Amino acid sequence: MVYLTRIEHFNAAHKLYNPDWTPEKNEEVFGRCANANWHGHNFELYVTIKGKPDPDTGFIFDAKKLGALVQEHITDKLDHRNLNVDVDFMRGKMCSIENLEVAIWNELEPRLPAFAKLHCLKLVET
């Protein structure tokens, strides 16, 4: 088994806010991330797949195709967007990094070919 990691970048805004809580509790728990006017980050997304290299190509999956898949289904939908408002697969969810990673996983996993398994995601927020 070998692993291939592709790194993609995007910029996006979001806020962490629980509507069932008071503004004071939201600020206590989420701090500046609960800002009513949102806040932005630069993100690095590491997508790692695993599999056995094809004997003819030496690839698990062509890295360019993996990049195109991630761009089409993830980064093009997230880049320069408000994650809470503009991204279908994040609507109605608390927009934490952890929930964003789960949503990205759910978007990517079924789109990969059977011979390339999604192994892990790493999302870096700066």
Describe these PLM feature segments.
Residues 1-126:
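Charge-rich, low-complexity N-terminal segments
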